[in-house]
């Protein structure tokens, strides 16, 4: 599969894509509205950052207890059901006078539900397109996410200014419900990829199996930690520029879009393989300039250039998919998503804490420096893994009896 037109001619790709697009727009609009609401109520950079990214902390609970559900639930019902629950939760958060602690309780509950939702969605995408089409399909989803964020943050900023954060939350809830309806009507019923009931024991066994490969382990860490630390920088946009945060979010999304187009469509596989680490360094380096507290114009340029580096995720994902056993696609990709979102939540909390003690600009600089340090630490391990297994597809040693996940190959 080599062209975008082939993707959209593939049955079920379009409804899955449209549902994800609506859900991303809803998340973007609601995140900005909720952060504005919390900042106005508390004047706290920490709570503001946590309102946008803190729910991701629930992902660590889901990744260690519920992730086996990613291959054991019917995909259509799960994708549409999660979007519906997010719509209801967003309506609840728009209730006037709702205490901040109740808002955070709802956010954490939704984060727990989403902990296996990513695995269901990406496992379904891998099933629809098969491995040879996964990178191109994922790049389209990433580009869509960038465009939806550009539109969502720009529209969200206007809506919050013209209407109110609570009205904006209600509009976002409508987008979530539209996403649920699109998935319900557009996807066909499929049996779960695995038999048996989800369980904590299955989740732990499969996580251990995936982490048994040093190369997979390094790839997971590269997908989780450097990117997550930079998301900690992004979580401080509202605190750094309260009235212009939408501008920074929109330019960051535009940079991410450019990075995904370049990585997924323009680079050859050979060149792409060499740019994983440089892109991760690019992702963090421009944020070091925030130590100078630049104005909104320079800040927007910095976040645009930095966000091109998010193209590194596609490069690492391509390598990870080649190393995933066929019978673990949903769980393995869900582990990637859950770990990524968990690290985003942890980083938002860390960045918010540093900003409370110092300033948002200082915190952004510290998080960027930490991201660069982690990338440089992990890079040698990835190069050693590549030298030991150059350009190969994964050959999995069968798991011992009792520990093999009972998953049917897609």
Short names for language-model regions:
Residues 1-13, 188-221, 396-403:
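Juxtamembrane intracellular "pre-TM" segments in multi-pass secondary transporters
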Residues 21, 25, 29-33, 163-170, ...:
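A single, central transmembrane helix in multi-pass transporters
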Residues 107-147, 153:
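Cytoplasmic helix-loop-helix junction between adjacent transmembrane helices
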Residues 32-41, 93-96, 151-171, 239-244, ...:
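Transmembrane alpha-helix termini and helix-breaking/packing motifs in multi-pass membrane transporters
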Residues 127, 169, 173-198, 379-392:
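Helix-loop junctions on the cytosolic side of multi-pass membrane transporters
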Residues 51, 55-71, 76-85, 92, ...:
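C-terminal transmembrane bundle of multi-pass solute transporters/carriers
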Residues 21, 89, 100-116, 297-311:
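Hydrophobic core of transmembrane alpha-helices in multi-pass small-molecule transporters
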Residues 45-46, 131-141, 326-336:
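Loop-to-transmembrane helix entry/capping segments in MFS-fold secondary transporters
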């Amino acid at each position: 599969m080599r062209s975008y037109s082939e993707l959209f001619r593939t049955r079920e790709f379009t409804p899955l894509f449209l549902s994800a697009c609506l859900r991303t727009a809803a998340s973007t609009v609601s995140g900005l509205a909720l952060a504005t609401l919390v900042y106005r109520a508390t004047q706290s950079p920490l709570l503001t950052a946590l309102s946008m990214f803190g729910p991701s902390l629930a992902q660590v609970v889901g990744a260690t207890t519920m992730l086996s559900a990613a291959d054991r639930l019917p995909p259509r019902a799960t994708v549409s059901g999660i979007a519906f629950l997010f719509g209801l939760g967003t309506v609840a958060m728009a209730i006037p006078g709702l205490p901040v602690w109740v808002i955070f309780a709802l956010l954490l509950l939704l984060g727990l539900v989403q902990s296996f939702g990513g695995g269901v969605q990406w496992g379904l995408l891998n099933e629809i397109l098969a491995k040879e089409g996964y990178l191109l399909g994922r790049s389209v989803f990433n580009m869509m996410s960038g465009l939806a964020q550009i539109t969502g943050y720009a529209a969200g900023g206007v809506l919050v200014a013209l209407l109110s954060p609570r009205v904006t939350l209600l509009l976002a809830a409508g987008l979530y419900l539209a996403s649920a309806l699109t998935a319900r009507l557009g996807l066909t019923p499929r049996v779960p990829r695995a038999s048996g009931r989800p369980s904590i024991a299955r989740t732990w066994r499969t996580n251990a199996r995936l982490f048994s490969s040093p190369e997979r382990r390094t790839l997971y860490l590269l997908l989780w930690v450097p990117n997550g630390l930079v998301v900690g920088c992004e979580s401080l946009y509202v605190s750094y520029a309260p009235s212009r945060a939408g501008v920074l979010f929109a330019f960051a999304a535009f940079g991410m879009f450019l990075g995904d187009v370049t990585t997924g469509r323009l680079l050859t596989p050979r060149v792409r393989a060499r740019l994983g680490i440089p892109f991760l360094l690019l992702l963090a380096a421009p944020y070091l300039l925030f130590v100078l507290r630049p104005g909104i114009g320079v800040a927007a340029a910095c976040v645009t250039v930095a966000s091109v580096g998010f193209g590194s995720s596609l490069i690492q994902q391509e390598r990870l998919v080649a190393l995933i056993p066929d019978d673990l696609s949903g769980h393995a990709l869900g582990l990637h998503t859950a770990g990524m979102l968990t690290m985003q939540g942890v980083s938002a909390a860390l960045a918010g804490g540093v900003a409370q003690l110092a300033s948002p600009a200082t915190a952004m600089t510290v998080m960027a420096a930490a991201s660069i340090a982690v990338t440089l630490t992990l890079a040698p391990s990835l190069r050693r893994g590549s030298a030991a297994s150059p350009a190969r597809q994964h050959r999995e040693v069968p798991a011992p009896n009792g520990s093999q996940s009972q998953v049917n190959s897609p």
